[in-house]
Design a protein with these regions (language model features):
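A glycine-rich beta-to-alpha transition motif near the start of alpha/beta enzyme domains, typified by
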Residues: 7, 11-123, 154-236
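Internal active-site segments that recognize and position negatively charged phosphoryl groups
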Residues: 137, 141-164
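Short, solvent-exposed secondary-structure boundary/capping segments
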Residues: 123-132
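Zinc-dependent deaminase
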Residues: 110, 132-135
Length: 236
């Protein structure tokens, strides 16, 4: 329930709070259009001091030709591009809500995704999520750019724990070179072994480091497979 705020009327809507690899989300079943995602309202709900608190908000809506549509909103309010960990959480939410079975296909801003609930016990689950084809690979300032459903910058570093993710991430996120995509998510990647990466991500919209980023992990793996170890078939 959102109240005691002059900006918004009192309302009561059921929601789920899901977390995947440290990314947390508010999820609403919006098949009956009960929620109007105004940016100021989304930001208020995601506020960690005065709202529910989340990295983002997602809506499950009806979609012809798929089990449902996933809409993702950044914690600062506007609708955004694909979120990988959000997609995994949405798949489990859809299963819990009866919107899909164990195997499902859902639409998102970047196209159709297929997901499968591999295990489900209580409120937890293990989800396999298919991503759309990465595109736009290019060299960028001291790193690389690739779009994995969201635009990502990837830079390899010697020690990811020593990186000023917030400061350097904010600088790179706002570079003029990335203005055409509305800014970019910034990933700092340490090669911890053959086929093993350590990744820290600064996410646009959250405007800070997050505990994980699904599309960022995919971006790191895509870039690493091209420029660091092209013969490795599996990357952790």
């Amino acid at each position: 329930r959102l109240g005691n705020n002059r900006k918004f009327a009192h309302m009561q809507i059921e929601f789920g709070k899901y977390e995947g690899a440290g990314n947390d989300f508010v999820i609403i079943d919006n098949r009956e259009r009960v929620f109007e995602p105004r940016p100021a309202l989304v930001a208020a709900l995601c506020d960690r001091r005065f709202g529910i608190g989340a990295d983002g908000l997602m809506l499950l809506e009806e979609e012809c030709g798929a089990d449902f549509r996933m809409r993702y909103f950044n914690s600062d309010g506007p609708e955004a591009t694909m979120c990988g960990n959000g997609g995994r959480c949405m798949a489990l939410f859809a299963r819990h809500a009866g919107a899909a079975g164990e195997r499902m296909a859902f639409a998102a801003v970047d196209g159709l995704h297929r997901a499968e609930v591999l295990a489900c016990g209580g409120d937890a689950g293990r989800i396999a999520l298919g991503m759309t084809e990465p595109h736009g690979f290019a060299e960028a300032e001291e790193g690389y750019f690739v779009d994995t459903g969201s635009p990502h910058y990837v830079r390899f570093v010697e020690d990811v724990e020593r990186v000023d993710v917030r400061g350097e991430g904010r600088r790179v996120r706002n570079l003029p070179a990335f203005a055409g995509t509305g800014g970019v998510n910034v990933n700092f990647v340490e090669v911890a072994g053959e086929g093993t990466l350590k990744v820290r991500t600064y996410e646009r919209g959250v405007e800070d480091e997050t505990l994980a980023c699904g599309t960022g992990s995919v971006a790191a793996a895509v870039v690493a497979s091209r420029v660091r170890f092209p013969q490795v078939r599996s990357i952790d």
